Amino acid sequence: MEAENKDDLSKLEFNEYITNLVNDITSLHANKIDVNLILNQRDSSLNLKYIIPIGLILNELITNSIKHAFKKEGNKLITIQFQEIENGLTKLSYSDNGVWIEKQVDGFGTELLLVLSDQLDGKMSRKSSTTEIEFNFSEE
């Protein structure tokens, strides 16, 4: 993982960081499940103020998908999109094609995601009865 400037450790290259993070998390579960990832990510650096909560959010979501959503055989797909929408507003979208378990929406994982979203000064939303979650935040 490379800092944008060797003298400036406050920013990391987003693409490299997310790719390494996702590969590390999924490789821990490689014997249990095969996960295909589609990463639509922007090509830029990101301040550590944002990258740390985003990394924790993705760790929680990916681990949750692997542990709970992918119970059946077949293609397991996780989609992560990170894009600037407008005027500094950024959207992080996460979804998987696994099974949604309704009873777990108020658990510790959900609370953690809400706290991390607050750290981003952002907003978390989830589409009903699906594992599709969005985080919107401003990088300013």
Regions found by a protein language model. Give the residues of each.
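Short beta-to-alpha transition helix within the HATPase_c
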Residues: 8-28, 83
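Conserved short alpha-helical segment within the C-terminal cytosolic histidine kinase catalytic core
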Residues: 4, 20-32, 53, 57-60, ...
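ATP phosphate-binding glycine-rich loop and adjacent ATP-lid/helix-beta elements
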Residues: 100-127
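Conserved short strand/loop->alpha-helix "switch" segment adjacent to the catalytic nucleotide/phosphoryl-transfer site
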Residues: 30-62, 66-74
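Flexible helix-coil linker/loop segments in the cytosolic histidine kinase module
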Residues: 1-13, 68-70
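Glycine-rich nucleotide-binding loop
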Residues: 77, 100, 128-135
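Conserved DxG motif in ATP/Mg2+-binding regions
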Residues: 91-98
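Short beta-strand/loop element within the Bergerat-fold HATPase_c
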Residues: 75-88
